[in-house]
């Protein structure tokens, strides 16, 4: 199981977390152990130290590890799944075999407040009461684009499941993927990010 810890730095991916998860995914793949990823990730840790340390390069290692893994891969989005960090945490777009989400999921480029500030900045600035307009735009953005079934409608998740059914859904999914076979490309080895 690969999971974010929302009680530590809100669950963001930093250099160390990306490295640790990449090694773990590669280890599971090497020994043919299926991978279940539990997502609650608001993004990569911002900051000059992270940028100078190579957060993009280290995040790419995690992306590479997931993309090369041939074992069964199941993802479950618990709450937040924002931006590039969501993509590298075994999203449907990089080849997760099955992706589920709880009704509390939020899949987006960023949170509703930040997105509304960027998308509707002109309307907010032109409003008589900018704070009221911002609150209204955030509410509309959440209602239209961040409801739990929006991701399923767009094919980002296979199903929205009841949290009480999670254990059985994962058991059934692992049983279904037990005989997964992946055709490998005809190459000696990959070229991972350094």
Give, region by region, the residue ranges found by the protein language model.
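Ligand-binding clefts of soluble mixed alpha/beta catalytic domains
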Residues: 2-194
